[in-house]
Amino acid sequence: MAGIDEIDEVIVRELRKNSRITLTELGRKVGLTASAVKNRIEKLEKLGVIKGYSAVVDPSFFGEFLTAVIEIELIDPDSPDLPRILTPILKMRNISDVYKKTGEFHLVIRGTFRDVESLNTFLKDLKRNYLRNLARRTRISIVLENFKEAGVTLK
């Protein structure tokens, strides 16, 4: 990417590992002053390299003990209505990831739920209010064990 050098790449890698690292500590790692690091981070934010900062939060804090992966086969994967229909889903606190992808299933939604009943309620609402006339079929998987999980942005 234009305007990015090796020092910027190190800064981004370090922030991915620990977004709470101090500017002084980060400066030590890249051989710059805290002020110079701050300027580089602001540049990376303006360029869109750094889109935000997140915390890895245990979903059980919110009473959500069940993680589900919902795959959706769309009737028309290129439907112009898709972005508008997905907008409210993207804003739901318990939905952490929504992807449009290649393959048999076109959408993947990952979310956390209190229990199977709340997952079922979400699925009924999803089909009735959002995916009516758009989805051919869905496939739901329950996560049994988590080995690695990225942070979830808190808004």
UniProtKB/Swiss-Prot annotation:
Keywords: DNA-binding, Transcription, Transcription regulation. One of its GO terms (cellular component) is cytosol. This is Uncharacterized HTH-type transcriptional regulator PH0045. GO terms for molecular function: sequence-specific DNA binding. Signal peptide: none annotated. PROSITE patterns: HTH_ASNC_1, HTH_ASNC_2. GO terms for biological process: response to amino acid. Residues 23-42 bind DNA. Gene3D superfamilies: 3.30.70.920, Winged helix-like DNA-binding domain superfamily/Winged helix DNA-binding domain. SMART domains: HTH_ASNC (SM00344). Pfam families: AsnC_trans_reg, HTH_AsnC-type. InterPro entries: AsnC-type_HTH_dom, Dimeric_a/b-barrel, Tscrpt_reg_AsnC-like, Tscrpt_reg_AsnC/Lrp_C, Tscrpt_reg_HTH_AsnC-type_CS, WH-like_DNA-bd_sf, WH_DNA-bd_sf. Residues 4-65 form the HTH asnC-type domain. The keyword DNA-binding applies.
